[in-house]
Amino acid sequence: MADRQLTMTAEVDLAIRRHGEETYPHECCGALVGRDSVVSACVPLPNTTEEGPRRRFLVRPSDYRDAERQTAALGGELLGFYHSHPDHPARPSQYDLDHAWPTFAYVIVSVVATNDLARRSAEQEGGAKAADMTVWYLEDDRSSFEKGTLNHAENSHPDAAPAVHG
């Protein structure tokens, strides 16, 4: 498969990183909105897993429909999803592979504890920092992911607020 690319503005990059830091030590998740492989906004979604939000995320069908509605209201298309990996690398897990849908981009951000206390306490203010961010695409045969190239564009406006819509 040819190298697939996804471009996002710096404001979207920052919004995803902040979401991961704010939800640490749990996984965050959200939708990627844009056109033609350019992400112009992200929509945070609730992580409703019952398996333990520290290692899993789940988007309910009703939240998916809400994301589609918000995407349409923003004038974009649903390009994919993002989620964080607390204290783990920004690469897909077997769980991610088992639950991925074709055609979507999957952005993963690694979020790491800044100290041992943060690793033990979800309430530690400023206790986590977003690290690597990667993008992945499900292979056509669904057997694995292919790593894509994540590019960054300039912000849409120098004074623009982070592109989180919720």
Task: Report residues per predicted region.
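Conserved beta-strand-loop surface patch within small alpha/beta domains used
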Residues: M1-L78, P86-G166
